[in-house]
Amino acid sequence: MQSAMKLFFIFLIFVFSVSCGPSAPQMKTRDVLERTHKCFLVGGECKSECSSWEYEYVFCYTGPCCVMREYKRVEKFSNTPKYTT
């Protein structure tokens, strides 16, 4: 009886340890989202191939992240003076 209980507990420990953690499809989905977000942060776009005036930043799920060569950061506040009348 004790050996059957030991085997049962070992089986339970194995089942619970294998079932914990993210599955492969969840990890793949998270990786795709992270790569797409990194591409978006630098002002890029995930495409099948980049043009001659773009460079490859990182690889997205669908292909390279194409960023314009003359990338300039978007400023939150405009430095141009406002005209008031």
Swiss-Prot record:
Give the location in the cell: Secreted
Q: What is this protein called?
A: Beta-defensin 18
GO BP terms:
defense response to bacterium; innate immune response
Which positions carry the signal peptide feature in this UniProt record? Answer: 1-23
Main role? Has antibacterial activity.
Query: Quick check: keyword Disulfide bond in the entry?
Result: yes
**What family is reported?**
Belongs to the beta-defensin family.
* Keywords from the UniProt entry: Antibiotic, Antimicrobial, Defensin, Disulfide bond, Secreted, Signal
Q: List cystine links.
A: 39-65, 46-60, 50-66
Which ranges of the sequence are coiled-coil? none
- One of this protein's Pfam families, by short name? Defensin_beta_2
- Which PANTHER family does the record associate with it? BETA-DEFENSIN 113
Q: Which GO terms describe its cellular component?
A: extracellular region
